[in-house]
Every structure is written in C-alpha cells, then in structure tokens.
Amino acid sequence: MARLAGVDLPREKRMEIALTYIYGIGRTRSKEILDATGVSPDLRSKDLSDEDLAKLREYIEESLKVEGDLRREVQADIRRKIEIGCYQGLRHRRGLPVRGQRTKTNARTRKGPKRTIAGKKKAK
C-alpha cells in the first residue's frame, strides 16, 4: 500500500483519485501534481514504482501544505478571527453559519439537532 503525507492510498484506485484521499488535495491539484511529476493519472496506486512514489512524495513535501500542517493553519486562522472579534469570529464562536447563509430555516449542520420547545396546551 502506497503511503504519501502520512496517508495510505487505496490500492485499486487510479492515481488521479487516490491522491484526493490526502487532506488538501482535490481533483484539480491531483492532476497538477501528476503532470508536474510525469506520473500517469491512469496508473493504479498498487502499480506505482518506487521511483514514481519518491517523485510524488518529494513534490508534495516541497511545494504543498497538506494534512496536519494545513489543518493546523486552518484552525489557527479560525482562532485568530475569534480573538480579534470580527464578524466571522463571532459566528464561529456561536456555532452559526459563517458565510452569510440563512438561519431562520436550515443551518442544522452548524446549529446541531433541533431543540423542541413545548407549545401551548389546549384548554378543554
């Protein structure tokens, strides 16, 4: 099993897809990496030679911020926004959508499960 940036790549997937299992690499960046290193996107990760694997590892380590480093940077950016008290920081602190989405309905992912409020009871 090929291992890049601390992630085990799936053996049966094409390299173009397998690289997207690394946090910070999507389809477009995956294609860019494969073009720059000269590795065929149609190769399966189980068929990679050690030379190809070394090329990919070197390219990713030198020119990209992925996995742990990228996660730390994103968390640091969020913490900074919370500390300076900007609008986005307040939204992060309150657990609400940050990018202007509506909250009267929807926004359940950020707000969590519904809290039901007891309604008025009918008098007989």
Swiss-Prot record:
GO cellular component: cytosol; small ribosomal subunit
HAMAP family from the UniProt entry: Ribosomal_uS13 (MF_01315)
Organism ancestry: Bacteria, Bacillati, Actinomycetota, Actinomycetes, Mycobacteriales
UniProt keyword terms in alphabetical order: Ribonucleoprotein, Ribosomal protein, RNA-binding, rRNA-binding, tRNA-binding
GO biological process: translation
Protein's gene: rpsM
Sequence segments annotated as region (Disordered): 95-124
UniProt GO molecular function: rRNA binding; structural constituent of ribosome; tRNA binding
Function: Located at the top of the head of the 30S subunit, it contacts several helices of the 16S rRNA. In the 70S ribosome it contacts the 23S rRNA (bridge B1a) and protein L5 of the 50S subunit (bridge B1b), connecting the 2 subunits; these bridges are implicated in subunit movement. Contacts the tRNAs in the A and P-sites.
Name of the protein in question: Small ribosomal subunit protein uS13
Similarity comment: family membership: Belongs to the universal ribosomal protein uS13 family.
Subunit record text: Part of the 30S ribosomal subunit. Forms a loose heterodimer with protein S19. Forms two bridges to the 50S subunit in the 70S ribosome.
Keyword Protein biosynthesis: no
